[in-house]
A protein has these predicted regions:
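Aromatic-lined glycan-binding groove of carbohydrate-active enzymes
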Residues: 1-31
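Carbohydrate-interacting/catalytic domains
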Residues: 36-45, 50-61, 65-195
Length: 195
């Protein structure tokens, strides 16, 4: 999992809140061009995809992190005056198509579908293809799926190369797709051929 039980409970921050902080309260409406929120959404998707695609067992979503629930959970107890205020998940956030939570929820569904499309995915070893700390690029394969990540907040690459098995590659899941709140910088219809 990307987020532990303790992070989502009172006294700590959820992963999305660590990435975006209070900006998610004021800048999570679609079309709001806030760099902190935009970067946090991108990282949230990539962190979850790296985690889900490198595991050898089950992938655990914890109480709303699949759509970036902003607040912690605090069950009624003596220390909070037996309050129910934070003893809930706000599922209405992911259902609201005017807010960015739906991007994260839709991405989560597509990510799970992609991983399930690969037969015996969790039994297939992860094979590192490339990593470059300076470029902040990571690539690995799992079965027939090639995962390529650009973690740089400021650099996009055209014609970036690394060695992969001979063949033709097409994009089946793109964290930068506009459908998931990305910039849409990749041509998802393009077939990438090895040379």
């Amino acid at each position: 999992y990307c987020e532990s039980h303790d992070q989502a409970l009172v006294g700590d921050k959820t992963i999305i809140f660590r990435l975006i902080d209070a900006d998610m309260y004021w800048h999570f409406k679609k079309g709001d061009e806030n760099d902190m929120a935009h970067r946090g959404i991108a990282l949230h998707k990539m962190i979850r995809l790296v985690t889900a695609s490198t595991i050898n067992g089950g992938y655990l979503n914890f109480m709303g992190n699949e759509f970036g629930h902003p607040e912690w959970i605090d069950f009624p107890r003596e220390g909070n005056g037996w309050s129910y205020k934070y003893a809930r998940r706000q599922w209405n956030l992911v259902d609201n198509k005017e807010l960015c939570y739906c991007y994260l929820g839709d991405f989560d569904k597509a990510m799970i579908k992609t991983i399930k499309s690969e037969k015996n995915f969790n039994k297939t070893p992860v094979q590192e293809i490339w990593h470059n700390d300076g470029d902040q690029v990571l690539a690995y394969m799992r079965g027939d799926l090639l995962f390529v990540f650009n973690f740089s907040p400021t650099r996009s690459f055209t014609g970036y190369g690394f060695l992969v098995p001979t063949g033709a590659y097409s994009i089946v899941l793109d964290t930068d797709n506009k459908e998931f709140g990305g910039n849409g910088l990749n041509d998802d219809s393009m077939t990438h051929l090895t040379t």
